[in-house]
From Swiss-Prot:
Substrate binds at M50, G198. Catalyzes the phosphorylation of the hydroxyl group of 4-methyl-5-beta-hydroxyethylthiazole (THZ). The keyword DNA damage does not apply. Keywords: ATP-binding, Kinase, Magnesium, Metal-binding, Nucleotide-binding, Thiamine biosynthesis, Transferase. It comes from the Bacteria. One of its GO terms (biological process) is thiamine diphosphate biosynthetic process. This is Hydroxyethylthiazole kinase. The gene is thiM.
Length: 262
């Protein structure tokens, strides 16, 4: 199994494209992370919109550049709105990304996520336990936290990618991104990033945005992981803990975009 590393030139090119296209991202995400997710997208140059009402979700999915479905705080009304948005996204050819939060721990969301897979997501982003559970290999995880190493989920990610046609992202100490054939590994980040709610969920929104960019979607999605890890490292170097990490992280994302435009 060959894992290729993402080059810095590829990442910089993708970030330039990101800022140039400024994707409009329809984020149907969980209640805990909405502000952080929106600010992450804004710092990178995207335009976030948090439209969740069923009557509006379908309409907005048709005009957005990309759609994110995050099941972190799933309810039946929210599932109805998400289903409507995904159906419209497929009809309108809007690329959509699934973040199957805690899919291995709870039956309702597992069944719902499996139902959504039939609408062919452009990308799926989760931790190792979530990806393995979604692929039907294991039902692990400790709530929203993983109990498996990212590398152990690569076979499940490849299977899921081949079955759905999605780019699958497994996040951890090292991130792995695959289309079922190629695998790209991304080093970096810091353990402190796991002590702040929303870093993974925000990454899923950035992944969704990257699916709307021209060029190699696998490399564009891998670049999203690289930007987040780079910004995390910079933020940790300047912060004293989780509380001061967040503003430094957003600043670091912004600075990355300024550097590729210089």
């Amino acid at each position: 199994m060959q894992v290729d590393l993402l080059g810095s030139a590829q990442s910089a090119h993708a970030l330039h494209l990101f800022h140039q296209h400024s994707p409009l991202v329809h984020c149907m995400t969980n209640d805990v992370v909405q502000t952080f997710t929106a600010n992450t997208l804004l710092a990178l140059g995207a335009s976030p919109a948090m439209v969740i009402e069923t009557e509006e979700a379908s309409q907005f999915a048709a005009i957005a550049s990309a759609l994110l479905i995050n099941v972190g705080t799933l309810t039946q009304p929210r599932a109805q709105a998400m289903r409507a948005a995904v159906e419209q996204a497929k009809s309108s050819q809007t690329p959509w990304t699934l973040d199957p939060v805690a899919v291995g721990a709870l039956d309702y969301r597992r069944h719902f996520c499996h139902e959504l897979l039939s609408f062919k997501p452009a990308a799926i982003r989760g931790n190792a336990s979530e990806i393995m559970a979604l692929a039907g290999i294991a039902n692990g995880g400790r709530g929203v936290d993983t109990t498996d190493a990212a590398a152990n989920a690569i076979p499940a990610a490849q299977t899921l990618a081949r079955e759905t046609g999605a780019i699958v992202v497994v996040t951890g100490e090292m991130d792995y991104v695959t289309d079922g054939h190629r695998i790209i590994g991304i080093h970096g980040g810091d353990p402190l990033m796991t002590k702040v709610v929303g870093t993974g969920c925000a990454l899923s929104a950035v992944v969704a945005a990257c699916c709307a960019l021209p060029g190699d979607t696998l490399e564009n999605v891998a670049s999203a992981c690289h930007w987040m890890k780079q910004a995390g490292e910079r933020a940790v170097a300047r912060s004293e803990g989780p509380g001061s990490f967040v503003p430094h992280f957003l600043d670091a994302l912004w600075q990355l975009t300024q550097e590729v435009q210089a």
